[in-house]
Amino acid sequence: MQHRVSIAAGLDAFVVVGFVAIGRRNHDEDPGVVGLVETAAPFVIGLVVAWLLARAWRDPWGWQTGALVWIATLVAGMLLRRFVFDEGTAASFVMVATGFLGVFLNGWRLVARMLANRRSAAAA
């Protein structure tokens, strides 16, 4: 079980940082690590909050966990970005973030469950 928790946490972090990296690249932002960390910080903090709220370690690959992690990461990240980090939260940005994070935070979980079910069926 601990193995699944580690994989889930790593994949979730990869999705969040990947979202930020792609966004920075598409907007011709400085490709340096410092800029990436500064931009990713509210969403990474949001992800940690989301994991705690969802108790994601209990069922890290579950669809309910994915949905809660997605929404909580998005909401916490946007609130932190706007009110703590004093950065923009334009409607178009919120929509893109909602779609990207929704597809990828839930998508990898869907694929993982399908593969696990397939292995279970093959072993039976």
Where are the predicted features?
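Membrane-helix boundary elements
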Residues: Q2-G35
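Membrane-water interface at the C-terminal end of transmembrane alpha helices
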Residues: H3, I7-A8, G102-A124
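Small-residue packing motifs within transmembrane alpha-helices
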Residues: S6-A8, P42, G62, F93
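Alpha-helical membrane-inserting segments
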Residues: V15-H27, I45, V49-W57, A76-L80, ...
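Membrane-interface helix caps and helix-loop-helix hairpins in membrane proteins
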Residues: D28-P31, D59-P60, D86-G88
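Structural signature of hydrophobic alpha-helical transmembrane segments
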Residues: G32-I45
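Internal alpha-helical transmembrane segments of multi-pass membrane proteins
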Residues: L53-V75, A91-T98
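Membrane-helix boundary connector in multi-pass membrane proteins
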Residues: L80-V96
